[in-house]
Amino acid sequence: MSFADAKQRFSNRVADYARYRPGYPPPVLDLLRTECGLRPEHVIADIGSGTGLLSELFLKNGNRVFGVEPNEAMRQAGEQHLASYDGFTSINGSAEATTLLNASVEFVTAAQAFHWFEPRAARREFIRILKPRGWFVVLWNDRRMEEAQLTRDYEGLLERFGIDYKSVKDSYPEVRNIRDFFESDDFVARDLPNYQILDWEGFRGRLHSSSFAPTEGHPNYVPMMAELERIFRAHQRDGRVRMEYFTRIYFGRLEGR
């Protein structure tokens, strides 16, 4: 898959993405305050800002945020969602070409977007827009498999019915990808617990928000939805299920050596 193709993958998923994707827990801010010295006056470039899930966390902290998003539909959804925040500026740009000024931000963040970047070009761009000794923070929500049968059943559904799930899953970042991106710069890894409580509508919407989930008319759609309903019925309590995640965070300074 080309990086250009990746930037359009979610165009027909925007409403479900905005409504049903998990956000990021407030302890993310506590961690960045403690480890990176995050303060409200710091400026954030949120790359692949999408519908604004991470941008909003920083805006509530008092930060000015540039939301850089290449997908028009996602960008418009983010603009609508964050319209009440004076500190938000929407940018039609990408990780490789943000359009931001040199040395203009203290933090570059990427939530659930790192695997869509062209790494070398993105690293050069981030070093350009970061102030000296600025921070790069990459994070994403990863479903917990070990002690949660629901997430294991859900994973099995994706593997069975997802259109190109394996290729997308193989592109998800691993520690070696993060290490390659930071090159000789040091970075730190942390995991924070996160979860969603979903009724049937939310559980369906969570699936439909994924770019690899077949849509109506695809031969996999009807059997996929039947299996999803079976999973929901098996795990629901009082009409709701709890989807468990880790919010995985990697952060470090980009020095440009």
Label the model's feature ranges.
Residues 43-45, 51-97:
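Class I SAM-dependent methyltransferase SAM/SAH-binding core
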Residues 96-107:
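A short acidic, Gly/Pro-enriched loop at the edge of an enzyme's catalytic core
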Residues 51, 175-257:
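Conserved Class I S-adenosyl-L-methionine
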Residues 106-120:
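A short SAM/SAH-binding and catalytic strip from SAM-dependent methyltransferases
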Residues 124-196:
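Conserved catalytic/acceptor-binding region of the Class I
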Residues 1-42:
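Conserved class I S-adenosyl-L-methionine
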Residues 33, 56-59, 123, 127:
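A structural alpha-helix within SAM-dependent methyltransferase catalytic domains
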Residues 12, 16-17, 24, 31, ...:
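Tryptophan-centric aromatic hotspots in well-structured domains and transmembrane helices
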